[in-house]
A protein has these predicted regions:
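Helical "substrate-binding/catalytic lid" subdomain
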Residues: 1-120
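Hydrophobic alpha-helical segments
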Residues: 120-130
Length: 130
């Protein structure tokens, strides 16, 4: 049960970080974005805690990035053992690994937004070279 719940948590928080990054990159008011999420069907205790952390770039640890990455690896190993595909988990695991490479191991797992930002910078550099 714990692995299934953590699969959802890890994937959801990576997606939430990406959504905040997308909203910010598109010039949206992030407080309006937070309000839209928290006043609709997507609202949860988790969004009410993590969106303000993302907006404020508060990476004080509640759940460490290193623990999130370890969790994704344990889940992936079990999924492979039982023959279950986990494409969302695999993508979020890659992002948490990239976040670790940015020295975010003891930062909150929402610091994964920095890995997403790094991908944006890399994509921009490739586009600029063309």
């Amino acid at each position: 049960m714990k692995l299934a719940v953590n699969l959802y948590l890890n994937s959801m928080l990576a997606a939430l970080a990406e959504a905040v990054h997308f909203a910010d990159g598109g010039g949206l008011d992030l407080e309006a974005f937070r309000h839209a999420i928290d006043s609709g069907q997507l609202a949860s205790d988790l969004t009410r805690v993590k969106i303000p952390k993302l907006i404020g770039r508060d990476f004080a640890v509640q759940a460490a990035t290193s623990d999130a990455y370890t969790s994704t690896r344990l889940i992936a190993d079990e999924a492979r053992a039982v023959g279950v595909a986990t494409p969302m988990l695999d993508l979020s695991s890659e992002l948490y690994r990239e976040s670790l490479a940015l020295a975010n191991d003891r930062e909150d797992m929402v610091a994964v937004i920095e890995a997403i930002e790094a991908r944006t910078r890399s994509a921009s550099e490739v586009t600029a070279v063309r």
